[in-house]
C-alpha cells in the first residue's frame, strides 16, 4: 500500500487507533501516517510508542477503564468533530503463567475469564459506545475491531482456548448488533470485525512453532492487508467478520 492507496475515504480523514502501542496497532499507525488522505491520527493507548510518527496525537486510554475512555474521547473531540476510521487493535490471549489458553474445562478460572472478556469484548464495545457518534454521515466511515478466526463458532472443530474463543465470539456479536443500530442512524457507516491472520507479535509468539513461515505475517504486512480490506468495504458489508484476505468468515 502506497500513499495513494486509501481511496474510499474523504480527502481529510481523521483516524483513531485504539491499542496503538501493540504490534499491529503501531504498524497501522505508521502506515496510515503515509496516506495522503489522512489528516489526523489519534494514537490511543496506555503508553505512547509512536513518538515522531507524522500526523499523530497521543491520547492516553486504558480500554479496561470506562472513565479513561471518556477522557480520551473528550480529548479527541477538542481537536476534531469527526472520526472517519476507528480501529480497535487491542486484545489478549495470555499473560504470564497464570493466564494461558485453556486446553481443558478443568483449567477454567473465573478471574481469567473476566480478564479476557474485559479486554477482548467489553473494552471494544465501550469504545464503540463513545466513538460511533463521531462518525460522519455524509461519507464513508468504518469502525473495525480486531477479532480472530478462532472466535467463529462454525469454524471451531478442535475446542480449547475457551476464554479467548468465547470473548472473540462475543465481540463479533456485539459488533453485529452495533452495525444494525448504526446502519439505521448512519447508512454510510460500516462496523465490522477483522481477523488479521497469524501475526508475529507478542500475542502469537508462544504458538508460532506450528505456523508455516508463509502464513506468519509481520505487523507491517498485516497492516497492509487490513487497510486494503477496510478500504474495499462497501456499506452492505457491515456486521460481518472479515479475514485478512477479504473473505467473510461465518460466525
Question: How should each PLM-predicted stretch be described?
Answer:
Residues 20-34:
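N-terminal Rossmann NAD(P)H-binding glycine-rich loop of SDR-like oxidoreductase domains
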Residues 30, 125, 169-180, 223-227:
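Conserved active-site helix of classical SDR/Rossmann-fold NAD(P)-dependent CH-OH oxidoreductases
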Residues 33-52:
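Conserved glycine-rich Rossmann-like NAD(P)H-binding loop of the short-chain dehydrogenase/reductase
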Residues 52-69:
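Rossmann-fold cofactor-recognition segment
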Residues 75-90, 94:
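A glycine-rich helix->loop->beta "capping" turn
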Residues 92-119, 137-185:
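Catalytic loop of short-chain dehydrogenase/reductase
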Residues 123, 127-131, 135, 174-175:
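Hydrophobic positions on the long internal alpha-helix
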Residues 201, 205-251:
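C-terminal helical subdomain
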